[in-house]
């Protein structure tokens, strides 16, 4: 068995193939010594509930294209599907009206952060928002909503849409603060970020992590 192991390491031209062969041989050694029937299998997949690939991740609307950054990832572990969205508000504009949608200046439409679907995110059972960087330039009291419509516009009231309040901060965010969602986006809803206070401006900072937890339906 040791000879077979060494041969596998020496003979594999692909280093990843060598690692796989080595692990397979180690499994054989353990099984022979213990009478077990261990096997190699993939525990996690970087995918959505139905094996979504990088080409089918959430896509932000044109109305927030000026945002400094936007990143989305899915992880499936067993039947648990976790969706993570990191947004940077830098470059976007908040009006001077409470619960107005934040987005590109000039009332840009489709100021959403992606559509939540069961196929990608699973059937939702929970969610939370974490402040990674305290907003500056605009209000630091930021709220999170979802809505049926994708057409919500910067400087427009999110309450003019068919909306659901996910997280209302009730005051200024602090770095590292996490708030659980008091309600969840309905399937096929779009995500929006809004002013939580009547204070406007162009954001020069403000990063948030939005997490959604679901199960493979």
Region roles according to the model:
Residues 2-217:
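Surface-exposed, low-hydrophobicity beta-strand/loop segments enriched in small/polar/acidic residues
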